[in-house]
Amino acid sequence: MKNFFYIYLSILLLFFVNCSNQNSKPKKLTIQILDTNVTDNSFNRLVEILNERFYQLEIEDIKIQRTSSNTFQIESAELLNKDDDIIRIILKRGFVEFKLIPEKEYVINVMNKVDSVLRNWIASNYEENFEDESSLDVYQQMELTDKDFSREHPFFSIALLDPQFRVADAFVREQDRDSLERFLRLSEIQNIIPEEIQFTFSAISQVDNEGNKFEMMYVVNKHSELSGDIIIDATASIDPSSEAPVINFTLNSYAADQWSNITAENIHKRIAILIDGLVYIAPVVRTRIPSGRCQIEGAENIDDARAIATILKSGTLPHSLTVIKDE
């Protein structure tokens, strides 16, 4: 009986050891570099920045191995315990831009033209064969509460403006974003959008009281007032007044001088801070900011805020990346 007990105990221990070994199996990500011209120098710089980001977030035992001219693998057991959103943020290129937002009257005028052209496009193509059938399918499938309004104002039926017109930012339901982007890509629409501006979206989704997700759509200047590796320090913390996560960052001396002049010349105007083309915050400039210190709000939690602060501090990756395999 005693021998049977020891045999049973040995089998049980072996089972737990095997489970432990399986659990410690490293997570492996295969990454594609979205550029055709990847030099050894640019790849080495990419690895250096990624290692710095992992180090700052206390993710250890990272192995990065190049597998082809434009692919590489990242391997670590610690990645198993990290949220996918954190990994996504770490792999962001991290290109920072400061862009002015045009006056709301100008933006609404542009939107009115887009709405009018889109209405005519739908009317002329609704019962005919046309090249971009996917866009029409989207229109037919949209879930709109007021069909009459959607026919007269197809743009404003999915780009919802503030009824009081305090700003010209538009609320876009998560399920409508693809439709809106597809409409904005139509050549008829592109031809009437002024060259000096662009439509873009918020980096972080919001949720209303009913649990519906939506994003903000902004119109910003194409020209950047500041851009590139201009940040020397960034930290994440909880704001004591709002109890929400914030990212505080400091510009380098050159950018701080430029920022001081930019804010002095644009009192009462809005400036958007973008990372990789998406807006994180678009505050009104109340006064000149001579210190070179800025703050970003809106991160979903403190872990996301730390990850964003890390990519700001580590600098811009020389190439954009995408995950093509996760195992």
Which residues fall in each region the model found?
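C-terminal motif of bacterial Sec signal peptides marking the signal peptidase cleavage site
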Residues: F15-N18
